Design a protein with these regions (language model features):
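Compositionally biased linear targeting/interaction segments
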Residues: 1-168
């Protein structure tokens, strides 16, 4: 049995609904922290986050490390960015800066929930192997070793509240 919400919701990089989406700083910070926990360079993760936000927003303005329609249209097999939330994590593969190696590294940790809400991780269902997700929700303030230790030290009955968990 696996908690289906033990993942980073790629759509939490943005806020809003439909085609009215803007960057969600908390989601961007969590995405960068997840990548760092996986050993990926922060600068690269920041650029991919910017490009993914540009992929989903409809404003046509290029973020610092992002890419809008002109970048994609100029490719050998031109296409346009979506301008809406991602329906499948595999859409990330079309985003500027995401090659097959990066996608393969990130894919096990990602999901595309039909909402822009941040992933509601349940610390009582996380396994030690899922510690990078805990690093992400802490914005990197909790290191990978510390996240693993906290999960390994979970009380037999779990934590009664999120406050009790974060008090660790």
């Amino acid at each position: 049995l696996r908690d289906g919400q033990a993942c980073f919701n790629i759509n939490s990089l943005v806020l809003g609904q439909g085609e009215d989406l803007i960057a969600q700083p908390t989601g961007v910070a969590q995405f960068i922290a997840l990548g760092a926990a996986l050993g990926l360079p922060r600068q690269r993760m920041s650029s991919v986050a910017d490009a993914a936000v540009d992929w989903m927003d409809a404003d046509g303005e290029v973020r610092a490390g992002g890419a809008e329609d002109a970048r994609y249209a100029g490719r050998a097999e031109g296409y346009r960015n979506a301008g809406v939330m991602m329906a499948e994590v595999s859409e990330l593969r079309a985003v500027q800066g995401v090659d097959s190696a990066l996608y393969a590294r990130l894919r096990p940790w990602l999901c595309a929930l039909p909402t822009t809400r941040l992933s509601p991780l349940n610390p009582n269902t996380l396994t030690v192997d899922q510690a990078p997700l805990l690093v992400a929700v802490s914005h990197g303030r909790l290191g990978l070793a510390a996240a693993k230790a906290v999960i390994a030290a979970r009380p037999a009955g779990g934590w009664s509240t999120l406050d009790a968990f974060w008090a660790q």
